[in-house]
């Protein structure tokens, strides 16, 4: 690339003040280098440079930001107050869609569509993956 990393960031902006509250690199180059590129080089993986992104975040009333738009096949949850990554899960392939949430029987779920083959070297496949959020304490 012609620019220095990071190549993707997640940024929180206070729209009333017009100020950036926090920002963080989004995505990790670990298994996303295509074999022809990776073979001749010895790169110290993972590289926390961020990956090109396709898709956007979902925000919850409880202050979580879910996003799966990166090329490293992960869905992540961040704390909206400080940008700290709280959770991540590996998906079958990249999630280039905005996650959504639904409730069944009092239990909250986050679901995301993954696939679409956004990168030439990415695994093909179209899947829907759902994650159950921890049950609320009684």
What are these regions (language model features)?
Residues 1-138:
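A fold-level detector for beta-propeller and closely related beta-sheet-rich head/sensor domains
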């Amino acid at each position: 690339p012609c620019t220095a990393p990071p190549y993707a960031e997640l940024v929180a902006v206070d729209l009333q003040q017009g100020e950036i509250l926090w920002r963080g690199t989004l995505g990790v180059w670990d298994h996303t280098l295509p074999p022809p590129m990776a073979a001749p080089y010895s790169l110290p993986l993972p590289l926390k440079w961020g990956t090109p992104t396709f898709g956007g975040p979902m925000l919850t009333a409880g202050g979580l930001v879910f996003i799966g738009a990166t090329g490293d096949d992960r869905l992540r949850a961040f704390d909206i107050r400080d940008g700290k990554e709280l959770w991540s899960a590996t998906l079958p392939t990249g999630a280039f869609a905005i996650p959504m949430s639904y409730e069944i029987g009092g239990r909250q779920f986050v679901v995301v569509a993954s696939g679409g083959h956004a990168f030439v070297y990415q695994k093909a496949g179209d899947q829907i993956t759902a994650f159950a959020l921890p049950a609320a304490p009684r």
